[in-house]
Amino acid sequence: MKTLAIDEEQLFLSKTIFEEEVYGEGFSIIAGVDEVGRGPLAGPVVAGACILPRGKIFAGVNDSKKLTPKERGKIRDILLNDPDVCYGIGVVSVERIDEINILEATKEAMAKAIANLSVHPDFLLIDGLHLPHKIPCKKIIKGDSKSASIAAASIIAKEYRDDLMRELHQRYPNYGFDKHKGYGTAAHLAALRAFGPCDCHRKSFAPIRQVV
């Protein structure tokens, strides 16, 4: 167990290299930013922004896609209940996605998440996208697997969006949103063919246009 704890600590520290580089440049409050839900056919796109306290270990923090739902939920609870962790969430609706396209909606969700931080960051580490912003920032490809703060943001955003999709399942039980979270699985596509799209489907996405 001790070896496992040491391994998890080292893994976390290996994901703070980008943060430490930015600290070395004189910045002091670094927020990681990531989005969840660009690809699904239904539901909003959600972004998370997270500021982790420097020097504090959060074992298990990793790319949300590499964690089981149980692991992800546990780490989310640890992050949200830690008084030294600051986080913000941004949500952009299906209607807005259809209006401005998913890329611009993703950027809008990220900007909202940053604005919803209770502490003002002086530097942003952003997963995969160049985000025009007044705060200095750095784009990191696959940042959710390389940066602890981006990984934390991805976990928070993923859990938040999954909760939203479970709520949508209560309103629209025919589609199985609680299982696939809006992604284009075979079961989801079959439901679309059987029932047609509902209000929370993205009408601008090709698979939805084909059944409208």
From Swiss-Prot:
Official protein name in the record: Ribonuclease HII
Q: Note the PROSITE patterns from the entry.
A: RNASE_H_2
Per the record, the GO terms for biological process are: DNA replication, removal of RNA primer; mismatch repair
* Role: Endonuclease that specifically degrades the RNA of RNA-DNA hybrids.
Tell me where in or outside the cell this protein is found: Cytoplasm
Q: What does the note accompanying the cofactor annotation read?
A: Manganese or magnesium. Binds 1 divalent metal ion per monomer in the absence of substrate. May bind a second metal ion after substrate binding.
A GO CC term attached to the entry: ribonuclease H2 complex
**Recorded family membership:** Belongs to the RNase HII family.
Q: Which cysteine residues pair off into disulfide bonds?
A: none
InterPro entries registered for this protein in UniProt: RNase_HII, RNase_HII/HIII, RNase_HII/HIII_dom, RNaseH-like_sf, RNaseH_sf
Entry keyword set? Cytoplasm, Endonuclease, Hydrolase, Manganese, Metal-binding, Nuclease
Q: Is DNA-binding there in the keyword field?
A: no
Q: Which domain of life is it from?
A: Bacteria
**Major subcellular site:** cytoplasm
Listed cofactors? Mn(2+); Mg(2+)
E.C. number: 3.1.26.4
Q: Start and end of every RNase H type-2 domain?
A: 28-212
NCBIfam families linked: PRK00015.1-1 (NF000594), PRK00015.1-3 (NF000595)
Gene3D superfamilies given in the database record = Ribonuclease H-like superfamily/Ribonuclease H (3.30.420.10)
